[in-house]
């Protein structure tokens, strides 16, 4: 199944942050290279655990988009919208994308080359490799049993998981 990815590929140099979609594309390619199964639901959980890792170990966040508490765990809506068409199928490597950095009407198809620096790639790889030890169902269960999701989740509502919930959780583990 081929996926059309729309991406404003950039890094916020001052904050050292990336878009969640940039991180998602990198994870997808890393998983394909390592022969790890990657579905969109698994990708969402991995992104959540990477953000937790950065809050705990680095003291900052890796991507600036909000994480929301959905019934099946933490979700980044921008990533969900791009990858949901895969349903429970494996995501193919991301080889090209539609560059929207100059606006919607000036998009160009470009070869995907990650803008993530090597230090961040190493940290991301570490978390992805740790997550590989667990099934997607287990990752969902783990994330739903952590206080950030528990505090934010309300049935039949979509609510943001504030970074302060992640910080509070990380300070207590």
Residue spans for each PLM region:
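Domain-edge interaction signal
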Residues: 1-173
């Amino acid at each position: 199944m081929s996926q059309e990815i729309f991406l404003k590929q950039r890094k916020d140099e001052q904050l050292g942050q990336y878009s969640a979609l940039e991180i998602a594309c990198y994870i997808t390619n890393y998983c394909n290279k390592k022969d790890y199964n990657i579905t969109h639901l698994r990708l969402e959980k991995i992104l959540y655990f990477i953000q937790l890792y950065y809050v705990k170990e680095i003291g900052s966040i890796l991507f600036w988009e909000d994480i929301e508490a959905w019934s099946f765990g933490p979700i980044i809506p921008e990533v969900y919208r791009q990858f949901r068409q895969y349903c429970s199928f494996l995501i193919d490597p991301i080889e090209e994308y539609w560059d929207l950095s100059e606006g919607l009407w000036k998009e160009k198809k470009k070869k995907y080359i990650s803008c993530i620096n090597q230090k961040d790639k190493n940290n991301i790889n570490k978390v992805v490799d740790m997550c590989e030890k667990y099934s997607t169902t287990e990752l969902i269960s783990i994330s739903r049993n952590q206080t950030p999701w528990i505090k934010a989740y309300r049935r039949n509502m979509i609510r943001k998981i504030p970074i302060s919930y992640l910080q509070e959780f990380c300070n207590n583990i």
